[in-house]
């Protein structure tokens, strides 16, 4: 499935809303609204205005706010060639949730207008479908809000500017909000069409999204709020949503990993539930592949923690694997001994173009685009430079649904609400591990990873004692599958595992790939790099290049510029799991005689 750019209606929803610093308030009079809701096609046009909000893909041109590689760089997978990005350390002045409420207002307008003005215009089937779409949008936006702020003011109706009690009400408890989201999601799954055309949201798209957000909420309830009954409710919803997609027979794992992200046309791929297509003729291009072309210098790249997380081809972690040379971290060996997603995600040679780690991500560019590197003096094709990129992005993948589904089932088994069978593992993790390999990968020695066996799970010595082995390995699968995509920081928060980002506790967060400089990068051992190249040996010793010790420059690349982040755990007045509301927003409420409670764990102001 694909969707296009609906430039004609890009500003459509603005006809029905206006903004201020607290919530989006409606315009006092909007003539367009009175005459708009007259047909199903008008509803479709209004619905289409949500697409780029929820399905940005690679972004457009230089513009991107939630694009892979470029925007998901705050987690334990990446290292910056500088001080690492910090967690919020004080209540900000002006940031808040106004942008979310803009979309909630738009969704509530859609719900209201369909119900109050279109019952005699739409058929019963049309009414149910479009109401399902509207409630899906509302549920998604509140799920996003709650994931960020915890308790939030809940609205299931269009707020009137004259109703100050409503406009300035305090937060609604998270469980009450999410119970309403649960109802919206259930309605959407029961009423959205199974098929509404190749460019439109259908029930399978809705189910994929519900599987994601229900899993997230179940985890929050289990690990952060210690509420097993609420956790069970949402884990069950995640499983049910996954079942809808999996039982349809429409989806499968058929493409090699790299082709998922480098192909221009994914319309016939069973791996993809929804994707964004790019078209130069329409002026719709992106820049993400340009930052994957091994010519563009990158200051953010994969760290050693991510590298070590990749499972060996026998299905075991690197410390317990029986694969020959499993403890050899040279890139050539990692490609042969690790899961195929490693080779598909990274350039096969260490390079200074990835300044923080010498390992360059190439996950989001087709293999053919890097053929220029085989030619002396070659340069990337114009299509893979600047904002000329045309490869499409799979905004919803079948693999994600499978991993959401199996994780939810595994979580339910820990809550006494079901069990996981080998058949479940085969339908999910093992189906993904059995995806086809690109011929170029095979020629480099890449192999498929052995199936996961429930009766013989790895005993990873790095596993947290409070995480069962099955969940540990499922979480590993997510990390390999979704590197540089949307989910890692969300995963750490919902598992209550932000300690994984503590650079004081884990040097692997600040170091990169293994580099044998004399053999692999001899041209970098020049006087101009004195004091700039530093490696960490396998035993943890640091060696800095001094112009004479080039032969010793073998180890994990660890430049002195890679600095750790400040403490963020168990610090008074800091809650790294939830985001504070800006003090100006709280002051605005107070000035009007109302109270807005600050986010849990944060003071009312930055003073």
Whereabouts are the PLM-identified features?
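Flexible, polar/acidic helix-loop-strand segments at domain edges
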Residues: 328-398, 601-607
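Long, intrinsically disordered, low-complexity segments
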Residues: 100-103, 180, 262-312, 433, ...
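C-terminal motif of bacterial Sec signal peptides marking the signal peptidase cleavage site
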Residues: 16-18
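An aromatic- and glycine-enriched ligand-binding surface/loop that stacks and positions planar moieties
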Residues: 20-80, 152, 178, 186-187, ...
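Short coil/turn linking the two alpha-helices of tandem helical-hairpin repeats
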Residues: 146-147, 153, 196, 216-225, ...
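Sec-dependent N-terminal signal peptides
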Residues: 5-14
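Conserved, well-structured interaction surfaces
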Residues: 41-56, 77-149, 165-198, 330-336, ...
């Amino acid at each position: 499935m694909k969707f296009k750019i609906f430039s004609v209606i890009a500003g459509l929803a603005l006809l029905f809303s206006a903004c201020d610093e607290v919530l989006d308030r409606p315009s006092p009079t909007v003539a367009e609204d009175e005459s708009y809701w007259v047909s199903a096609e008008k509803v479709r046009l209004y619905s289409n205005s949500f697409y780029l909000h929820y399905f940005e893909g690679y972004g457009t041109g230089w513009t991107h706010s939630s694009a892979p590689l470029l925007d998901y760089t705050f987690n334990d997978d990446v290292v910056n060639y500088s001080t690492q990005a910090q967690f919020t350390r004080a209540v900000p002045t002006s940031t808040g949730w106004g942008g979310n409420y803009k979309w909630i207002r738009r969704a509530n307008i859609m719900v209201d207008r369909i119900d109050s003005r279109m019952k005699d215009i739409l058929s019963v089937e049309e009414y149910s479908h479009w109401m399902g779409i509207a409630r899906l949008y509302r549920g998604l936006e509140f799920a996003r809000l709650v994931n960020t702020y915890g308790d939030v003011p809940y609205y299931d109706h269009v707020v009137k500017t004259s109703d100050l009690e409503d406009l300035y009400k305090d937060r609604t408890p998270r469980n009450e909000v999410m119970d309403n989201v649960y109802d919206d999601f259930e309605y959407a799954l029961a009423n959205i069409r199974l098929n509404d055309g190749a460019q439109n949201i259908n029930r399978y798209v809705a189910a994929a999204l519900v599987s994601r957000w229900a899993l997230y909420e179940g985890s929050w309830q289990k690990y952060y709020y210690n509420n097993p009954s609420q956790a069970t409710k949402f884990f069950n919803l995640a499983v049910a949503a996954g079942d809808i997609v999996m039982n349809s027979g429409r989806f499968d794992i058929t493409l090699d990993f790299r082709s998922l992200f480098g192909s221009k046309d994914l319309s016939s791929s069973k791996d993809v539930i929804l994707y964004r297509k790019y078209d130069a003729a329409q002026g719709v291009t992106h820049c993400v592949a340009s930052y994957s072309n091994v010519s563009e210098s990158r200051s953010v790249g994969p760290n050693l923690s991510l590298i070590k997380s990749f499972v060996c081809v026998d299905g075991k972690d690197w410390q317990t694997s029986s694969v020959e040379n499993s403890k050899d971290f040279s890139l050539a060996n990692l490609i042969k001994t690790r899961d195929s997603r490693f080779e598909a995600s990274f350039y096969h040679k260490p390079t200074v173009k990835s300044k923080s780690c010498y390992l360059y991500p190439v996950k989001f560019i087709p293999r053919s685009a890097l053929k220029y590197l085989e030619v002396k003096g070659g340069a990337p094709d114009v299509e893979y430079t600047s904002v000329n990129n045309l490869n499409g992005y799979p905004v919803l993948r079948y693999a994600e649904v499978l991993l959401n589904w199996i994780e939810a089932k595994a979580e339910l088994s820990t809550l006494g609400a079901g069990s996981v069978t080998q058949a479940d593992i085969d339908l999910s993790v093992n189906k993904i591990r059995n995806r086809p390999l690109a011929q170029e990968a095979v020629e480099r020695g890449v192999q498929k990873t052995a199936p996961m066996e429930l009766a013989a799970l790895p005993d990873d010595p790095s596993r947290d004692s409070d995480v069962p082995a099955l969940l540990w390995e499922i979480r590993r699968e997510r990390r390999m599958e979704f590197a540089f995509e949307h989910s890692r920081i969300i995963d750490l928060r919902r598992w209550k595992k932000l300690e994984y980002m503590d650079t004081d506790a884990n040097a692997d967060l600040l170091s990169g790939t293994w580099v044998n400089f004399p053999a692999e990068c001899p041209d970098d051992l020049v006087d101009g790099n004195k004091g700039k190249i530093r490696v960490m040996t396998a035993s943890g010793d640091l060696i800095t290049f001094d112009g004479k010790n080039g032969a010793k420059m073998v180890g994990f690349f660890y430049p002195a510029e890679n600095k750790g982040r400040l403490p963020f755990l168990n610090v008074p007045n800091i809650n790294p799991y939830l985001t504070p509301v800006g003090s100006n927003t709280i002051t605005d409420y107070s000035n009007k005689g109302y109270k807005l409670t600050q986010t849990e764990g944060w003071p009312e102001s930055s003073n």
